[in-house]
Regions:
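Active-site acidic/histidine clusters and adjacent loop/turn architecture
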Residues: 2-54
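Short linear motifs in intrinsically disordered/low-complexity regions
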Residues: 13, 25, 29, 34, ...
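Soluble non-cytosolic domains of exported or imported proteins
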Residues: 26-34, 59, 102-109
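A general structural signal for well-ordered alpha-helical packing
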Residues: 36-40, 65-66, 90, 112
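Extended, low-complexity, intrinsically disordered C-terminal regulatory tails
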Residues: 41-75, 121, 129
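Alpha-helical scaffolding within the catalytic cores
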Residues: 75-81
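Catalytic cores and adjacent binding grooves of peptidoglycan-active enzymes
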Residues: 81-179
Length: 179
C-alpha cells in the first residue's frame, strides 16, 4: 500500500481525537490568513496524528525568510522569490508522535490529508507541498487565493445541476434581486 493510500485509510479510520493546538502553535500562526488558521483548527480535530506549528511555520518577515534561505531551509530568498509565508498564506507543520517532533513522510502525509479534508469541508482550496512535481515540501500547506489575494472559495457541496436562471413571476427564482 502506498504512503498516500495508508494516509487516506488512517484518516478515514480516525475517530474524533483529543488533539488540540498548543499555545506555541497558536502563537506561531499569528499573522496567518484567518481562513488558513480556521483550516488548521479543523485539521487538528480530524487528524489521526497530532501536529504542531514550528516557530518559523507561520507568517515570516522578509528578514526571517532570507535567514531561512541562507540556512538552506527554503528555496525562496524573500526578496527576488517571495514565500507564501511572507503573505500569511502558508503554514509548515510537524508531527507530534510519542512526545517528540517527527518529520517522517507517513506522518506528514496523514496530517496533510487532514488539512486537505478540512479545507474541503470549509469550502477552501489548499495546496500541499508534497503534491508538487519538482520539489517535495511535505510539512508545507498553503492557501490558494484568487488573483486579488482573497482565499479561493469553492462550493462545499458540489452539484451537477444547472444553475437556475432567474425569471420574473417564477416562484422558484423570483426574488428581490435584479437579473
Amino acid at each position: 500500500m502506498t504512503d498516500v493510500k495508508k494516509a487516506k485509510v488512517s484518516l478515514n479510520n480516525a475517530k474524533k481525537n483529543k488533539f488540540k493546538l498548543g499555545v506555541n502553535s497558536i502563537l506561531h500562526m499569528e499573522g496567518v490568513n484567518p481562513a488558513l488558521v480556521e483550516i488548521a483548527y479543523k485539521a487538528i480535530e480530524i487528524t489521526p496524528i497530532d501536529f504542531g506549528i514550528p516557530s518559523t511555520g507561520g507568517y515570516r518577515t522578509g528578514i526571517e525568510q532570507k535567514f531561512l534561505f541562507h540556512k538552506g531551509v527554503t528555496k525562496a530568498d524573500g526578496l527576488v522569490k517571495r514565500s507564501k509565508h511572507q503573505d500569511g498564506l502558508a503554514l509548515d507543520f510537524f508531527a507530534y508522535v510519542d512526545g517528540k517532533g517527527s518529520w517522517e513522510p507517513e506522518h506528514l502525509t496523514a496530517i496533510a490529508g487532514a488539512f486537505k479534508e478540512s479545507a474541503k469541508q470549509l469550502g477552501y482550496v489548499v495546496e500541499w507541498g508534497g503534491d508538487w512535481p519538482n520539489f517535495k515540501d511535505l510539512p508545507h500547506i498553503e492557501l490558494v487565493t484568487t488573483p486579488g489575494g482573497d482565499p479561493l472559495k469553492v462550493e462545499k457541496t458540489a452539484t451537477l445541476a444547472e444553475p437556475k436562471i432567474k425569471e420574473k413571476n417564477d416562484p422558484e427564482t423570483d426574488g428581490d434581486e435584479e437579473v
